[in-house]
Curated annotation (Swiss-Prot):
The lineage of its organism: Eukaryota, Metazoa, Chordata, Craniata, Vertebrata. May regulate the kinase DMPK. GO terms for biological process: negative regulation of apoptotic process; protein refolding; response to heat; somatic muscle development. InterPro entries: A-crystallin/Hsp20_dom, Alpha-crystallin/sHSP_animal, Alpha-crystallin_N, HSP20-like_chaperone. GO terms for cellular component: cytoplasm; nucleus. It comes from Rattus norvegicus (Rat). Interacts with DMPK; may enhance its kinase activity. Residues 55-163 form the sHSP domain. This is Heat shock protein beta-2. PANTHER family: HEAT SHOCK PROTEIN BETA-2 (PTHR45640:SF27), HEAT SHOCK PROTEIN HSP-12.2-RELATED (PTHR45640). Belongs to the small heat shock protein (HSP20) family. GO terms for molecular function: structural constituent of eye lens; unfolded protein binding. Keywords: Cytoplasm, Nucleus, Stress response.
Length: 182
């Protein structure tokens, strides 16, 4: 018995899977629930939450996001299959990479739905925001990529000088000065 160990990831350890996730799944916003998802409760054992059943035809990828950092490049994959290419916007603001998408109300298999999301990634310090490239695959996976190892971008800090204003004159002192001056 002493030779067996039970794997356990405590939140205070580096192995804790949810402390810094590289994948974000189960983001099927605005879609209906299947009957088995309503009747089957979510299992909770310690730090494990069972994901909802994968829908037929979607392969469990809808709405998923994956982030990869390697020696040579920064990569992010985001499922935007519910949106047309014209409805997706990618931009960088300082060291932030922002992906947003929005579509107006349209008919789907459950009724009418409109969707909107915004996801922001923090770029590593050695990634130039001007070199980020985006490509959309035929199945709706957005590939965001930028080379690493370039120049280290310094954060611009503007320190504002604080000038000291003179104290306002005391009204009592002004009266004394006025009395002294005949």
């Amino acid at each position: 018995m002493s030779g067996r160990t039970v794997p356990h990831a405590h939140p205070a350890t580096a192995e804790y899977e949810f402390a810094n996730p590289s994948r974000l799944g189960e983001q099927r916003f605005g879609e209906g629930l299947l009957p088995e998802e309503i009747l089957t409760p979510t299992l909770y054992h310690g730090y494990y939450v069972r994901p909802r059943a994968a829908r037929a035809g979607e392969g469990g990828r809808a709405g998923a996001s994956e982030l990869r950092l390697s020696e040579g490049k920064f990569q992010a994959f985001l499922d935007v299959s519910h949106f047309t290419p014209d409805e997706v916007t990618v931009r960088t603001v300082d060291n932030l990479l922002e992906v947003s998408a929005r579509h107006p109300q349209r008919l789907d298999r459950h009724g009418f739905v409109s969707r909107e999301f915004c996801r922001t990634y923090v770029l590593p310090a050695d990634v130039d925001p001007w070199r980020v490239r985006a490509a959309l695959s035929h199945d709706g996976i957005l590939n965001l990529e930028a080379p690493r190892g370039g120049r280290h971008l310094d954060t611009e800090v503007n320190e504002v000088y604080i000038s000291l204003l003179p104290a306002p004159p005391d009204p009592e002192e002004e009266e004394e000065v006025a009395r002294v001056e005949p």
